[in-house]
């Protein structure tokens, strides 16, 4: 019996997964127009001419909101599998989840107290 007999489907999938992007790039090179005129380099903004410059300075407060969002989004990612398997897990897993949630509540209170959630 051949050693790799169970991997034919995987190898086929791997070849197709490699061939599709290569085929798309080659098709683009063949079909795409070759001209590089000035209109092609212009910015397209919903079919209208862009107004103003694109280089504006964002307020640093957006960074804090994004950071707090990412922290609590990751919390959701970690708590979802726990919630799905809640019936099969024991008391120890429940206590661990409560400790995890308590740490995140403390982090939220800290961010709130430091003013990370205020826009003034």
Swiss-Prot record:
Q: What is this protein called?
A: NAD(P)H-quinone oxidoreductase subunit 3
Tell me the gene name.
ndhC
Q: What is the lineage of its organism?
A: Bacteria, Bacillati, Cyanobacteriota, Cyanophyceae, Synechococcales
The protein's GO terms of the molecular function aspect are: NADH dehydrogenase (ubiquinone) activity; quinone binding
Assembly description: NDH-1 can be composed of about 15 different subunits; different subcomplexes with different compositions have been identified which probably have different functions.
Q: Which InterPro entries match?
A: NAD(P)H_OxRDtase_bac/plastid, NADH_UbQ/plastoQ_OxRdtase_su3, NDAH_ubi_oxred_su3_sf
Coiled-coil segments on the chain, per record: none
> What's its catalytic activity?
a plastoquinone + NADH + (n+1) H(+)(in) = a plastoquinol + NAD(+) + n H(+)(out); a plastoquinone + NADPH + (n+1) H(+)(in) = a plastoquinol + NADP(+) + n H(+)(out)
Question: What's the protein's topology in the membrane?
Answer: Multi-pass membrane protein
């Amino acid at each position: 019996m051949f050693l790799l007999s169970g991997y034919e489907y995987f190898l086929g999938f791997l070849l197709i997964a490699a061939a599709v992007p290569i085929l798309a790039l080659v098709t683009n090179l063949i079909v795409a127009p070759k001209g590089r005129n000035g209109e092609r380099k212009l910015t397209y903004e919903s079919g209208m001419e862009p107004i103003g410059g694109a280089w504006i300075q964002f307020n640093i407060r957006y960074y804090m909101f994004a950071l707090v969002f990412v922290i609590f989004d990751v919390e959701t990612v970690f708590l979802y599998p726990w919630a799905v398997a809640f019936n099969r897990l024991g008391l120890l897993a429940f206590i661990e989840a409560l400790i995890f949630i308590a740490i995140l509540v403390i982090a939220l209170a800290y961010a709130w107290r430091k003013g990370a959630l205020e826009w003034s």
